């Protein structure tokens, strides 16, 4: 893959830089540049309130080293000590922040986006994604609205600390109490990304018979026709090898989707239902409560309520799930896309940890993932269509389009409470997402097509 043509010192208009649902993200050379990273690093160093080092991790993208260096330069210019972790899963960063009492951390990754994109996620001293107030201060600094007087103390220094990844691996093993998986045939799709740093190693350490797909760090192939957004290679490998289960990760390994031994997909809703049921049966699920987002399937919600459970819904984004779990004291939450958060394991979305939990729970009960999935809910037919809307203001203000909102209301009336419509602007890509689910699959197809066509017609009009 050829490198994109851009001037390395270009910087996007600061007025256009804002944190989305998962930090800053975009095409390297236009939305994300080394100059922007330098400034973001500096302002992170200024606004993070706690003392201590600032940790920086990265996925395998070829632009990652450039951006890590720029962030470290900005942070040290602001007087901060920096520890660079090298290639690691995103959840390693908040875990190590908490372990060492660090001031915060950054992850250079664009998650499931294509290789030519990159991004910056920022974490506070508690390991959670940075709150909106501090994000706003960083944005204000980029716009020149925060004072930038010289620090009274010396500049900081940067230290390479890739050795700390071993501590994260030990935390993963401890999360399942080192329970053995001797001889269990498991396929792992490591997506050419962050999961290559530890995914195969921890499963092999527990004795699993591991088959690895896309198992080297490759910044030009990360997420390309593999991983949690392209499950067919994993599904095919599980069936060909007669594996008990398979797990696919995204580029930075903070999410995971699974495939059972029959080739059926186990998405985040099923993970929540099955793991939540295990916690409920063990009497360790406070208020029988799970937290999910507006994208979670209606079949999941009704099946969980039939078990006597409560389901709280949040906007899309694991930071919203995190906030709701903290408020309610929920033990488990997540997203259909595979971000799963457990209060017993640090409240950070962690794909490798979730995969270990599923494998351990199944093996401990003497059942297969397919057996377990048979006990799960029947999902309502659901379809998601992405409509490309390059104009950000139109995308964000789609609800102001009366023709589109009227059509949404018509669709909801026609389903008479046995289905729903969700239209939302993506926080990470120039897309309007249109989702319809209903008991009647014909209604799903009909309304998805009509709504997507209407969105394209009205929001992309000249």
Swiss-Prot record:
EC category: isomerase
Keyword Glycoprotein applies = no
Q: Which cofactors, by name?
A: Mg(2+)
Write down the SUPFAM superfamilies for this protein, in alphabetical order: Phosphoglucomutase, C-terminal domain (SSF55957), Phosphoglucomutase, first 3 domains (SSF53738)
What are the entry keywords?
Isomerase, Magnesium, Metal-binding, Phosphoprotein
- What is any one GO biological process for this UniProt entry? peptidoglycan biosynthetic process
Phosphoserine PTM positions read 111
Q: Where does Mg(2+) bind?
A: 111, 250, 252, 254
Q: How are cofactors bound according to the entry's free-text note?
A: Binds 1 Mg(2+) ion per subunit.
Post-translational modification (record):
Activated by phosphorylation.
MF GO annotations:
magnesium ion binding; phosphoglucosamine mutase activity; phosphomannomutase activity
List, alphabetically, the GO terms of the cellular component aspect: cytosol
Q: What is its EC number?
A: 5.4.2.10
The family database entries (Gene3D superfamilies) matched by this protein are listed as: Alpha-D-Glucose-1,6-Bisphosphate, subunit A, domain 3, Alpha-D-phosphohexomutase, C-terminal domain
Q: Quote the protein name from its UniProt record.
A: Phosphoglucosamine mutase
Origin species: Synechococcus sp. (strain WH7803)
Question: Gene name?
Answer: glmM
């Amino acid at each position: 893959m050829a490198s994109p043509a851009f001037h390395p010192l270009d910087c996007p208009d600061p007025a256009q830089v804002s944190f989305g649902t998962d930090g800053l993200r975009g095409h390297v050379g236009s939305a994300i540049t080394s100059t922007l990273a330098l400034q973001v690093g500096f302002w992170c160093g200024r606004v993070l309130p706690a003392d201590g080092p600032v940790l920086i991790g990265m996925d395998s993208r070829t632009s990652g080293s450039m951006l890590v260096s720029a962030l470290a330069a900005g942070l040290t210019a602001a007087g901060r000590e920096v520890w660079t972790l090298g290639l690691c899963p995103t959840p390693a960063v908040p875990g190590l922040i908490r372990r060492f009492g660090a001031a915060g951390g950054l992850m250079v990754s664009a998650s499931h986006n294509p290789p030519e994109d990159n991004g910056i996620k920022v974490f506070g001293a508690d390991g959670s994604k940075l709150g909106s107030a501090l994000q706003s201060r960083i944005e204000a600094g980029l716009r020149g609205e925060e004072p930038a007087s010289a620090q009274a103390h010396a500049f900081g220094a940067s230290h390479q600390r890739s050795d700390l990844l071993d501590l994260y691996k030990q935390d993963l093993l401890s999360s399942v109490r080192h329970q053995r998986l001797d001889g269990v045939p498991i396929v792992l799709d490591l997506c050419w990304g962050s999961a290559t740093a530890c995914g195969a190693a921890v499963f092999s350490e527990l004795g699993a018979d591991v088959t690895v797909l896309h198992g080297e760090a490759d910044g030009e192939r990360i997420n390309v026709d593999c991983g949690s957004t392209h499950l067919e290679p994993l599904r095919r490998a599980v069936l060909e090898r007669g594996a008990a289960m398979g797990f696919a990760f995204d580029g930075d390994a903070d999410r995971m989707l699974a495939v059972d031994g029959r080739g059926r997909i186990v998405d985040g809703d099923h993970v929540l239902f099955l793991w939540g049921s295990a916690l409920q049966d063990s009497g360790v699920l406070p208020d029988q409560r799970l937290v999910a987002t507006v994208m979670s399937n209606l079949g999941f919600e009704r099946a969980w309520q039939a078990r006597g459970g409560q389901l709280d819904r949040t906007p899309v984004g694991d930071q919203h799930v995190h906030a709701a779990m903290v408020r309610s004291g929920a033990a488990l939450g997540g997203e259909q896309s595979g971000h799963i958060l457990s209060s017993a394991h640090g409240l950070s979305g962690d794909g490798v940890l979730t995969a270990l939990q599923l494998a351990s729970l199944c093996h401990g009960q003497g059942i297969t993932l397919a057996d377990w999935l048979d006990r799960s809910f029947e999902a309502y037919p659901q379809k998601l269509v992405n409509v490309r809307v390059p104009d950000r203001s139109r995308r964000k203000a789609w609800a102001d389009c009366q023709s589109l909102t009227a059509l949404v209301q018509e669709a909801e009336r026609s389903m008479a409470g046995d289905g729903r419509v969700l239209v939302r602007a993506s926080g990470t890509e120039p897309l309007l997402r249109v989702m319809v689910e209903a008991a009647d699959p014909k209604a799903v197809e009909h309304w998805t097509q009509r709504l997507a066509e209407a969105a394209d017609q009205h929001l992309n009009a000249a």
